């Protein structure tokens, strides 16, 4: 984030004389940048707000509001960050960067309907915005609007054939839609691009498990653990697989290993009771 902040604020500084002969605005931006370089987030925020107060209605201040919002997100002050992004969009309602920032924050806050509004507005401005396509597809999938989710994922894969997250999302969506052949085709492409991606093996293992092809499922789960032996989620997945074909001792051992690696002891204990 810091690099992007500095680049855009340097742009503001370069343009400031054209906006106003008053140098106070530019001086405050310089001070804010120095505070940011020193990682003094609260101080930087205070100074940027002082700069905004000098020129509150200027479109340039939309950028400052945006970065105040980003600083607040870093401090987990989400409601205040949302307020800053709202002010930024009042000054620059078609800013793609701020729309994306606000959409991302709304997703973090569990406000998917608000995020969806911003993503749709952003994609109206720029139909090929990759990040917006991905997050809108994700929200559509969560809302069980699978046709809309598929359209966004497919558009994104056309734009970025090596977009791992989009292909993975499309594979999972196809599997959910009971289109197993298409799901496996997307998995094959993923493994062609990323042959050592543990997550892809785990996902394919889960697909085989749903089809009760336990031998292939176990092969993929083992491969995922071989590639990422410190990932507790993979041990939980393999434990659940062992449960399916009544290997209770092996399932219990994997649950315990997952706890050792940081998984929730309470959740794993509940699953272990079912396995014993």
Please place each PLM-identified region on the residue numbering.
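N-terminal leader/linker segments that initiate helical-solenoid repeat arrays
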Residues: 18-67, 74, 276
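Short coil turns that delineate tetratricopeptide repeat
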Residues: 56-59, 93, 127, 161, ...
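Helix-start (N-cap) detector for alpha-helical repeat units in TPR-like alpha-solenoids
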Residues: 25-26, 59-62, 96-97, 130-131, ...
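Structural signature of tandem alpha-helical TPR/SEL1-like repeats
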Residues: 40-46, 75-87, 109-121, 143-155, ...
